[in-house]
Amino acid sequence: MKSEQLKIPQATAKRLPLYYRFIESLHAAGKQRVSSTELSQAVKVDSATIRRDFSYFGALGKKGYGYNVQYLLSFFRETLDQDERTNVILVGVGNLGTALLQYNFSKNNNTVITHAFDVDEKKIGTKVGEVPVYNWDKLEEIGLQNVSIAVLTVPASQAQKSADRLVKAGIEGILNFTPVRLSVPAHIRVHHIDLAVELQALVYFLKHYPL
């Protein structure tokens, strides 16, 4: 995302890829315009929030007309750097890591897992979903040219050590699937995805906030 647009709220920034994916599908279907209400129904974000999110970028639509799909597609493609390929590595080729490698961000044309790392000799030298698996001990030798993001799917006991090593190797962003809250330098961005916590939260909301 362009540096001048980083001042938008983080919650808004997280929704932009969701908007882009739906707008992309509208364009593929030949639709020429869309309203905030239609967007709301599709992405499950209320229309007022969508209008507020869009307002951070100026006049993207017209009152009474809605939004031009082609214009939105071009705008978000540029905003989300869709024409620039982002190389990603994955550390930990267990069950979850394997699933992510086989998926390999198939809906994100500009994001590709190029390398995977593990300590299991049976996995090293193989390919999972066309992604080669390398020896974790050879990380520094292989090098991470043009790679700034890592997906972390190692056992919890290895999470912090792995993160420390990734930071030293030049990684700037970590998508952390482990339950460990990583301690990293201030300039490193970490997004935590704890499936157990999300499931517990869902159970709680179902019990205490019925729809």
Curated annotation (Swiss-Prot):
GO terms for molecular function: DNA binding; DNA-binding transcription factor activity. PANTHER family: REDOX-SENSING TRANSCRIPTIONAL REPRESSOR REX, REDOX-SENSING TRANSCRIPTIONAL REPRESSOR REX 1. NAD(+) binds at G92, V93, G94, N95, L96, G97. Homodimer. GO terms for cellular component: cytoplasm. It comes from Shouchella clausii (strain KSM-K16) (Alkalihalobacillus clausii). Pfam families: CoA_binding, Put_DNA-bind_N. SMART domains: CoA_binding. This is Redox-sensing transcriptional repressor Rex. Residues 18-57 bind DNA. Belongs to the transcriptional regulatory Rex family. Its main location: cytoplasm. Modulates transcription in response to changes in cellular NADH/NAD(+) redox state. It is found in: Cytoplasm. Keywords: Cytoplasm, DNA-binding, NAD, Repressor, Transcription, Transcription regulation. InterPro entries: CoA-bd, NAD(P)-bd_dom_sf, Rex_DNA-bd_C_dom, Tscrpt_rep_Rex, WH-like_DNA-bd_sf, WH_DNA-bd_sf. GO terms for biological process: negative regulation of DNA-templated transcription; response to redox state.
